[in-house]
Each structure stands twice: as structure tokens, then as C-alpha cells.
């Protein structure tokens, strides 16, 4: 099964990634991906693009050869207050805001601190999706985070890269997150976290967890472009209004 939506990708603008927007579009066409988000690392990361990169994402076309592009960021959660490294009116220019913990910006400490920081990011209203919350380097109170995400309408990511490239040992945590999300009505999304275009839309390991816990497909954001766009619009992203009509006739893939 090929899902048509990928919310988490990195380009050469993050210098530890290896593909361009053109590369991603080419692979998207090959794989049947209809909508993907360009979410390079926030500027607090050492090799992240400059702040202006995100301000200027408006130059990206909405559609190229039938593939839609979301203008976004994977911001860094910086502290226990849940602050991120992108702010103010500039956030309103983005279609999608991901945020997560990254060691160079916010080193791991303890479960209580991680949980408070993540929940504060969720409560801030600035973050749409929490990335790789199953990272074993940052243990959290999974039930508390899932409850908060459900209450504030924020999605939690099951990050496929965590099972294949980085954050090894994430499987048990991600399974627990999926189970808690099912119980508390939390929205989930699978993210490839691609750092090279070849892995765009690669969700096999994440999908296995979704299937294992029998998470409801109706709450999975990858189910269709229109589902993701409706989620983003409901969260106040007026910028996606011009994309919504382009996917009005799509149907869930599962």
C-alpha cells in the first residue's frame, strides 16, 4: 500500500541531507505521492538553513507535475517551556510546523523534564506535529503526552526513520504511543523523515506498528491529501486554502 502523503522531509538546505526539491518531486511522481511537506531543520541546529530560508519558502510553487508541496519546518523544542526556534508572524507564512527534540539544541535530561517540555510545545498552539516522540534518548510519560495531544488537536508522529537509520530502539516506545493514541483519540501521522529523496513515502516499519495496534485509519493524517489539508486548515493555517481545491476529489487510500 502506498500512502499519498508524507509530512516530514529534508533537503540539501539541511546540509546533512542530500536531495533537492526537484529530486523529491521526481520520486513523488514515481511512487504516487501526491503531497509532501518540505520541513528542513529549524535554524537553531548547527547545519540548518538560515532563518530567511523559511521566510522565503513562499517562492515554492504549490503544484509541480501534479505533486503538491507544503511549505514547512521541523522546528526545535528548545527548553522546558516548549519554545521553538521559529516565531511570530513568520509562523503564519508556513503551511505546517513540526517540532521535536534534537540533541544539539536541547540535550536529554530526565523523563519529567522531557514530558513537560513536550506538553508545553503541544499547548503552545504553534506546533502541528510532534516529531519522533518515541526517541529512547528522550523518555516521556507517553499517556500524558497522548492525552495532551488529543486535547489540543496536535498530531504525534510515528517516525519511520527511527527504525532504520537513527534513534535505534524506538520500536517499543512507538508501539506504546500508537496504543495510547488509539485509546485517547490522538491523531497520528507517519513521517518518513527522509534525508534523501529515495526514502520519500517509506512507511513500512511505521505502518507495521499502526497495523499491530489496529489504530483507526480515519484518524491517520496520511490517509489522503485532503485529510491533512483539513487538519492544517482547522489548526489555523490559512495558507493552505489555495491547495484544498486541488485535492477536493481525492479519496482515502485505506
Curated annotation (Swiss-Prot):
Cofactor: Zn(2+)
Keyword Hydrolase: yes
Family: Belongs to the PHP family.
Keywords: Hydrolase, Metal-binding, Zinc
Binding site for Zn(2+) 1: 8, 10, 74, 193
Binding site for Zn(2+) 2: 16, 41, 195
Lineage start: Bacteria, Pseudomonadati, Pseudomonadota, Gammaproteobacteria, Alteromonadales
SUPFAM superfamilies: PHP domain-like (SSF89550)
The keyword Transmembrane is annotated on this UniProt entry: no
Residues that, per the record, bind Zn(2+) 3: 74, 102, 132
Documented EC number(s): 3.1.3.-
InterPro entries reported for this sequence: Phosphatase_YcdX_put, PHP_dom, PHP_phosphatase, Pol/His_phosphatase_N, Pol/histidinol_Pase-like
CC cofactor note: Binds 3 Zn(2+) ions per subunit.
Gene Ontology biological-process entries: bacterial-type flagellum-dependent swarming motility
Domain of life (superkingdom): Bacteria
The name this protein goes by in its record: Probable phosphatase Sbal195_1503
GO-annotated molecular function: phosphatase activity; zinc ion binding
The species this protein was found in: Shewanella baltica (strain OS195)
GO CC terms in record: cytosol
Amino acid at each position: 500500500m502506498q500512502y499519498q502523503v508524507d509530512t516530514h522531509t529534508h533537503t540539501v538546505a539541511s546540509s546533512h541531507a542530500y536531495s533537492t526539491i526537484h529530486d523529491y518531486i521526481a520520486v513523488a511522481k514515481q511512487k504516487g505521492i501526491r503531497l509532501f511537506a518540505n520541513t528542513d531543520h529549524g535554524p537553531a541546529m548547527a547545519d540548518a538553513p538560515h532563518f530567511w530560508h523559511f521566510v522565503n519558502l513562499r517562492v515554492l510553487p504549490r503544484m509541480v507535475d501534479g505533486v503538491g508541496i507544503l511549505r514547512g519546518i521541523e522546528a526545535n523544542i528548545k527548553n522546558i517551556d516548549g519554545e521553538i526556534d521559529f516565531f511570530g508572524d513568520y509562523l503564519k507564512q508556513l503551511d505546517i510546523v513540526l517540532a521535536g527534540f534534537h540533541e544539539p539544541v536541547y540535550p536529554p535530561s530526565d523523563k519529567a523534564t522531557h514530558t513537560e517540555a513536550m506538553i508545553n510545545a503541544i499547548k503552545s498552539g504553534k506546533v502541528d506535529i510532534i516529531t519522533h516522540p518515541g526517541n529512547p534518548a528522550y523518555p516521556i510519560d507517553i499517556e500524558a503526552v497522548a492525552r495532551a495531544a488529543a486535547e489540543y488537536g496536535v498530531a504525534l508522529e510515528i517516525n519511520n526513520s527511527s527504525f532504520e537509520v537513527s534513534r535505534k530502539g524506538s520500536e517499543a516506545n512507538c508501539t506504546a504511543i500508537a496504543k495510547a493514541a488509539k485509546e485517547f483519540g490522538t491523531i497520528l501521522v507517519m513521517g518518513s523523515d527522509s534525508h534523501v529523496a529515495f526514502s520519500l513515502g517509506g512507511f513500512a516499519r511505521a505502518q507495521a506498528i499502526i497495523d499491530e495496534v489496529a489504530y483507526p485509519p480515519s484518524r491517520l493524517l496520511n490517509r489522503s491529501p485532503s485529510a491533512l489539508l483539513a487538519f492544517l486548515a482547522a489548526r489555523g493555517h490559512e495558507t493552505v486554502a489555495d491547495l484544498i481545491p486541488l485535492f477536493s476529489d481525492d479519496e482515502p487510500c485505506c
